[in-house]
């Protein structure tokens, strides 16, 4: 594709030399070290470093031109031979150029975007599952992986950056996908990563405290999430949780004809449930929808999973799926790795062990409340908090575990570059003196100790890391999987 054709999509680019107007762009790179002959380098400003400052490395590697911010040009002025193009809006420039280069793949798929603090991963998996059951080829992009039939790749971000995102969408189109289901993070919306993606369905699950190390406050966090439902992104219907305060605000802000609300108990919502019966292996009841009512049996436990189920049902109903087909598929849903995932080494195991990704105050509370009815003995919670992240949620999480669990093991999560002991102290600040938690900084030892100390009938909840198979210590990522450590401890326990 010619450079002038790409830049025609961007109104904030200046100073394109005429000699380069017909230059052929072979690829787009945002990493200067990855550039090769014929590539276009887009240097994105970051929170710590402006990637545009590395344009000399990109040009030296063969890039035909570099698009960078005015600040990067000022800090590292180009010499005569280097073609450096300045853009006042790098976010929009990158997204627009990437979408154009890959042939606007988002327009060739029916896209579903799911945003919210909690529930994105389960909801997107449910939507993908229902579409697949209807024999509709679907691409899934989210926290765990990007996948479609015949392809799977571990994810590095909940929502890929613009160039990678457009490339993956194009690959999905080429693979024959008709639908794309995407977790859309607040970071992605604030940074414009999904510009150029017209969503047929936008889902809002909830908003609770998280990412306040990035967003200035909850209103800023909400404003980022709400972008998904602006005309720039949403072309079809919004599916919004009416049980959430921020969801109620969104419902009021949008045109009623564009919204389907959902609620587990409120019959005034467009989608709701009745006749709920909670059983050891899931929930049964009736789902009420604008397309009719249907009985269902779900293997998922917890009210929050009923909310996720309603959101997914609403999304695929709007996409044209048959309600009875959806209901027939629900009992077959296999679940999501690291989300209320049971760890079992034999069917006669005398304790239950559950691994879950809960890493916010709200999700941790939901996990503990959902697990309680299925644990006849004591509920033991092993948890920590991530380093270099919002410190204010740590004492809140400590308080929640102190109130809802019978025994608390406070340990490390991903401390990153922060002092692990300071993280533990922040958590302990929320635990009242009347509760005596066990504090073990080494997560592997904490898991082993909790499982070995458990008595028959107890349940051990390993919260915070879920599907993750790594731990970040300093700047190093080491292999660590809660499920592996749990199995090892369960095996040791059987030999006692």
Curated annotation (Swiss-Prot):
It is found in: Cytoplasm. Meso-2,6-diaminopimelate binds at residues 389, 413-416, 464, 468. GO terms for molecular function: ATP binding; magnesium ion binding; UDP-N-acetylmuramoylalanyl-D-glutamate-2,6-diaminopimelate ligase activity. Pfam families: Mur_ligase (PF01225), Mur_ligase_C (PF02875), Mur_ligase_M (PF08245). Keywords: ATP-binding, Cell cycle, Cell division, Cell shape, Cell wall biogenesis/degradation, Cytoplasm, Ligase, Magnesium, Nucleotide-binding, Peptidoglycan synthesis. Pathway: Cell wall biogenesis; peptidoglycan biosynthesis. Signal peptide: none annotated. Its main location: cytoplasm. HAMAP family: MurE. This is UDP-N-acetylmuramoyl-L-alanyl-D-glutamate--2,6-diaminopimelate ligase. It comes from Nostoc sp. (strain PCC 7120 / SAG 25.82 / UTEX 2576).
